[in-house]
Design a protein with these regions (language model features):
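Bacterial N-terminal signal peptides that target proteins for export
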Residues: 2-17
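Acidic, polar-rich low-complexity tracts and alpha-helical solenoid repeat scaffolds
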Residues: 2-6, 25-274
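Bacterial N-terminal signal peptides
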Residues: 15-25
């Protein structure tokens, strides 16, 4: 009986020892597998490696390196640069939401940064190019035909840039993009007005065209909005309003192609100087 008890106890000890050894082996393997290869790297080396990865298009590899650098070089200009580079990598990698989040954090944490103008510019650019880019040459879809939320947020970021940093090297490009955005917002209203007009909903077309004219100033889309008013009043036989609008059209747009050629093709956007 005693021998049996000792034998049972010995087996239990052996099993426990084997389990412990196995656990240590597994833990050791896991530690080796998950070892941080950058543990002994200098911040400058991490930065160089991250730039190389981003330069080759491996944004998924560059982003975690920039994140490590933010921690390793915290409180230094290099950490700020890493944060901006990470935002750019997120943007180029197709994660616009994360890029905006990173930039918002940068703007909040570093209000005195010499790179703050770039942060605003990049934030505007991310929203400007959201989903389809400046132009979609494949689908021929321009900004006025897309969701306007991103366009408005892009405009706000560019506006912050040019108002706070009018002499920034990024401001001239931002102003051009702002002009395009404003026209695209007006053109979006005109697109709806044109849709209503094509369906014979002339009152609705008038309302949307008037909204574009009331809300926006000095943008190319207003020429088409005015022409839509003219044609809608004509269709409704509202002679006085039609004639008044024709006089406005002739005075404001004396060489308008609309009066001779009708509605312009949406395949030929006005914006040519990009």
């Amino acid at each position: 009986m005693l021998v049996s008890k000792l034998s049972t106890a010995a087996k239990a000890i052996m099993m426990s020892a084997l389990a412990g050894a196995l656990s240590m082996a597994v833990t050791g393997c896991g530690t080796t597998a998950s070892a941080d290869r950058t543990a002994n790297w200098s911040p400058n080396r991490i930065y160089a490696e991250a730039k190389d990865e981003a330069g080759s298009g491996a944004y998924d590899k560059a982003i975690p390196l920039y994140e490590k650098l933010e921690g390793r070089a915290a409180g230094t200009p290099l950490a700020q640069q890493a944060q901006l580079n990470k935002a750019f990598a997120q943007y180029k990698g197709g994660d616009q939401a994360q890029a905006i989040s990173t930039l918002d954090r940068f703007i909040k944490l570093h209000p005195a940064s010499p790179a703050l103008d770039y942060a605003y510019y990049l934030k505007g650019l991310v929203n400007f190019n959201d989903n389809l880019g400046l132009f979609s040459f494949i689908s021929r879809q321009d900004l006025s035909e897309r969701d306007q939320k991103a366009a408005k947020e892009s405009f706000e970021a560019f506006r912050d840039l040019v108002s706070r940093f009018p002499e920034s090297r990024y401001s001239p490009d931002a102003r051009l993009r702002m002009a395009y955005i404003v026209n695209s917002l007006a053109q979006s209203e005109v697109n709806v007005a044109r849709y209503y007009y094509s369906r014979g909903a002339y009152i609705a077309a008038i309302n949307r065209a008037q909204t574009a004219i009331a809300d926006y100033r000095d943008v190319p889309a207003l020429e088409e909005a005015t022409y839509l008013l003219l044609k809608s009043y004509e269709a409704l036989n509202m002679v006085t309003l039609r004639d008044d609008t024709r006089r406005i059209m002739e005075k404001t747009y004396p060489k308008s192609a609309y009066t001779t050629g009708g509605f312009k093709s949406v395949d030929k956007p006005w914006y040519k100087f990009w």
